[in-house]
């Protein structure tokens, strides 16, 4: 499957981290920003109002994590939590995401950078 077909956007001209998460959710029978009719489905910060809010103590694999990015309040990054690692006094999250160095990859993020953690919504007809 071509990336633009899966995402529904042109990854050359679109910041596509949110489109990737929406595609993963839809392929896994979860509601996405697209399927719930969110007004801004292609923005990472659109996920700030999605699903169930989760604390850092409750986080589990598959939860959605939103991070800040850039200087504008609408900018952000979104990915899926895989696991955490503690190094000294710091906690890091392994995040699976799209548009991380222009590709789908797993990247380590400091827990202090987290804006929100959300639990996905399972579609009712699965």
Regions found by a protein language model. Name each.
Residues 54, 71, 75-126:
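Aromatic- and glycine-rich peptidoglycan recognition patches
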Residues 1-61, 71:
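Catalytic cysteine-centered active-site loop
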Residues 60-64, 91-93:
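Loop/turn elements at helix/coil->beta-strand transitions in domains of secreted/extracellular proteins
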